[in-house]
Design a protein with these regions (language model features):
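Metal-ion/cofactor- or nucleotide/acyl-coenzyme-handling active-site neighborhoods
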Residues: 1-266
Length: 266
């Protein structure tokens, strides 16, 4: 593992004073007219590409950092990059894979990608508090990318690094239901759910029922930690950057609210 993310240098301030839309994947997206995003710079993550069933536009930047999700969706992510050369896919070089006994091992993502593509960029990722990334929003991603409690935090971190001055969140519902049909294993988490999950039914927590549909592997969400990370980011934002929650049905109150469609009336 290299010590610096030199490949990220070319993205620093690449979108100085521009606006970006960060698409989290909550079911509230189904209540929004996302055709407005045609021609906009949109960040996406995980299985967010399922939105392409409904819209012609594509994400400009795409991310997956969760150790369980990245390997469960690795073929899909590679195909996304292969089919969409104008989309840049950002992935961690390696991740800590949590096992049922509570122990973890390091597994390389980079080595399991079928072949190198120009639009796949790998980075080193470190936990909050590591001196290479700091308290929750690293402003020099060459040093390291913050290991988040939600991939949406990673997207905000990259948006700040790229120089965007207006960052609009959509689909950040920050609300989950885990029913009895979900298979649980591993250690018990603070919200009363075990850490390692496998779905057996349709997914009620995202905009597409197949997102974490039958057989999909995921980690138990910890909304308290998610919100705490969002709040850390808010405190660390540069003064010239405005982050606004333009979604609906969202329990994320760390950022100011704004109306999605009114953004396009400017």
């Amino acid at each position: 593992m290299g010590s610096l993310n030199l490949d990220l240098g070319k993205f620093r301030d690449i979108h100085k004073a521009a606006r970006a839309f960060i698409m989290a994947n909550g079911p509230s997206l189904n209540k929004m007219d996302l055709s407005y995003l045609d021609g906009e710079i949109v960040f996406g993550a995980n299985a967010g590409f399922l939105i392409y069933k409904h819209y012609a536009w594509k994400h400009k930047y795409f991310f997956c950092v969760d150790a369980r999700v990245v390997f469960d969706r690795l073929d899909d992510l590679f195909q996304l990059a292969l089919d969409n050369p104008d989309t840049v896919l950002f992935l961690p070089r390696s991740v800590n894979v949590l096992h049922e006994d509570g122990l973890s091992t390091v597994r390389s993502v980079e080595e399991e990608i079928p072949k190198k593509l120009q639009n796949i960029v790998f980075f080193n990722m470190y936990p909050i508090g590591d001196p290479r990334v700091g308290a929750g929003l690293c402003k020099n991603l060459i040093r390291g990318v913050t290991e988040p409690f939600t991939v949406t935090a990673t997207m905000i971190e990259f948006a700040v690094y790229m120089g965007f001055s207006e960052v609009y969140l959509i689909g950040a519902d920050t609300n989950y239901q885990i029913d009895s049909s979900v298979k649980q294993s591993g250690s018990m988490g603070p919200e009363g759910v075990k850490s390692l999950l496998i779905s057996t039914n349709d997914d009620p927590n995202h905009f597409d029922a197949s997102y974490f549909g039958p057989g999909r592997k995921w980690h138990a969400p910890n909304t308290n930690r998610m919100i705490a990370h969002y709040e850390r980011i808010k405190m660390l934002l540069p003064p010239q950057v405005r982050v606004c929650n333009a979604g609906i049905d969202s329990k994320l109150n760390a950022y100011e609210r704004c109306n999605f469609e009114s953004i396009f009336e400017k």
